[in-house]
């Protein structure tokens, strides 16, 4: 069960023009596919968020993992840490650069690099042993994983450029009516039982109206959440919490920093309003949890194995959340089926996963998927945990080659929602937050 080779393949997939507080998604988003080849000829796959730095880091590791066991994750982590940890403090974080209100912290190069390797190693070991990846993580506690509909304000267009345009499956949604129509389509096609709206795009009054319209359309039993990506001041966050106290299951990252979130929490509680606050922005590493608990700033943490350091590390996050009576869900970014199935296996082994999981996956066009059989289907908003070896999916080599060729052809590299907003929305677009 030794690793004989590691391949790193950058790929591109079309991305619709989805809006968020920093700006707008570019026509393409890139990912990194990690392949570990075993001594029996089988391959395991992992998927990472693309940045030029992460690509370089993974390439550094690729030449020195030969001979390591697919289950010797401690050795793999030592290799990654030794190669990358020395210069972490000097790097700018390629993701957080879009969110200038987030408190500066060291980039998570080791966590992000190791995560994709760990997933690939679990996939490989599962295939070699004939067991699903979740069994290697302690065994599943649920037979299926439930996801939430993830709504975005959206311009017309399906992503891609030139002669590589995608069909606009969901249409424009830049109004309250458009958001409700988008939600109905997501629920009808996938059966999602809960709904999340990416906010921070329009003045809060309009986004409050959108949440109320969703409540009216879907009734009192469908959980609703909103995430403005820290676009609001503390005062505005309190106002929104007050206005939507009857509608929201939780309020995600209304304002920046742990102290800011703590102040919102205290002021709402003083008014008798107990809306849980969630985050994937002010608590993104273990060292930030103590302050968050002291401040009572966050009641729900959105884990993400891509950023927290892998599947086992995110399992540990779940145990810490349970210790402090915190809820847990999962954060999402634009991703392919490898990451989706890694999320499914992680959710399957995390008892304290108390909320439906976020996913961008419905926004992925069928033609951009690289796993065999095409896009993975949701049934009643759920994906069953596979009993097949590894992650339960295989990579379509031809589709992988096409996605890599697309990456080589396009000019987009590190994600830049802000820069693209200056190109297509307003040349003077500012990413400064809070905006309201």
Stretches with model-predicted labels:
Residues 197-339:
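Catalytic core of soluble alpha/beta enzymes
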Residues 146-180, 228-233, 278-282:
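Active-site mouth loops of central-metabolism enzymes
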Residues 4-13, 312, 316-320, 335-436:
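Flexible C-terminal active-site loop/helix
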Residues 108, 112, 119-160, 335:
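Glycine-rich, aromatic-flanked loop segments that form ligand/cofactor-binding clefts
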Residues 3, 41, 117, 130, ...:
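Conserved, mostly hydrophobic/aromatic
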Residues 177-194, 237-249:
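Alpha/beta enzyme core
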Residues 1-45, 49, 56, 362-370, ...:
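Structured beta-strand/loop patches that form or line metal/cofactor-binding pockets in enzymes
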Residues 37-128, 427-436:
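Metal- or metallocofactor-binding catalytic centers and their adjacent structured scaffolds
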């Amino acid at each position: 069960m030794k690793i004989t080779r590691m391949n790193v393949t950058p790929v591109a997939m079309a991305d619709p023009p989805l809006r968020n507080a920093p700006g707008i998604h570019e026509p393409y988003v890139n990912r990194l596919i990690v392949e570990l080849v075993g001594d029996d000829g089988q391959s395991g796959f992992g998927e990472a968020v693309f940045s030029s730095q992460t690509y370089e880091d993974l390439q550094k590791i690729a030449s020195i993992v030969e001979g390591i066991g697919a289950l010797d994750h401690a050795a793999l982590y030592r290799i990654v840490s030794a190669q990358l940890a020395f210069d972490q403090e000097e790097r700018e974080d390629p993701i957080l650069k879009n969110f200038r209100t987030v408190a500066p912290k060291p980039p998570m190069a080791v966590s992000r690099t190791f995560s994709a390797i760990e997933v690939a190693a679990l996939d490989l070991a599962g295939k070699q042993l004939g067991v699903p990846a979740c069994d290697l993580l302690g065994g599943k506690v649920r037979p299926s994983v439930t996801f939430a509909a993830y709504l975005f304000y959206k311009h017309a267009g399906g992503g891609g450029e030139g002669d590589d345009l995608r069909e606009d499956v969901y249409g424009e949604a830049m109004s309250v009516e458009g958001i409700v129509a988008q939600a109905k389509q997501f629920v009808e096609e996938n059966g999602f039982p809960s709904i999340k709206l990416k906010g921070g795009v329009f003045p809060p009054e309009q986004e409050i109206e959108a949440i109320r319209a969703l409540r009216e359309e879907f009734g009192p039993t469908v959980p609703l959440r909103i995430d403005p990506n820290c676009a609001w001041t503390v005062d505005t966050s309190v106002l929104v919490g007050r206005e939507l106290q009857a509608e929201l299951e939780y309020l995600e990252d209304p304002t920046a920093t742990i102290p800011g979130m703590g102040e919102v929490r205290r002021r709402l509680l003083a008014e008798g309003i107990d809306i849980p606050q969630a985050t994937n922005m002010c608590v993104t590493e273990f060292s930030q949890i103590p302050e968050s608990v002291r401040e009572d700033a966050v009641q729900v943490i959105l884990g993400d194995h891509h950023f927290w350091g892998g599947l086992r590390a995110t399992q540990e996050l779940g145990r810490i959340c349970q210790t402090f009576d915190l809820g847990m869900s999962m954060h999402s970014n634009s991703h392919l089926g490898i990451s989706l199935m890694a999320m499914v296996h992680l959710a399957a082994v995390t008892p304290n996963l108390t909320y439906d999981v976020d996913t961008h996956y419905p926004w992925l066009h069928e033609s951009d998927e690289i796993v065999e059989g095409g896009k993975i289907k949701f049934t009643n908003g759920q994906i069953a945990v596979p009993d097949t070896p590894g992650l339960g999916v295989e990579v379509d080599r031809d589709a992988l080659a096409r996605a890599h060729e697309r990456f080589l052809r396009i000019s987009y590299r590190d994600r830049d929602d802000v820069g693209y907003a200056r190109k297509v929305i307003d040349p003077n677009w500012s990413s400064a937050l809070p905006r309201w």
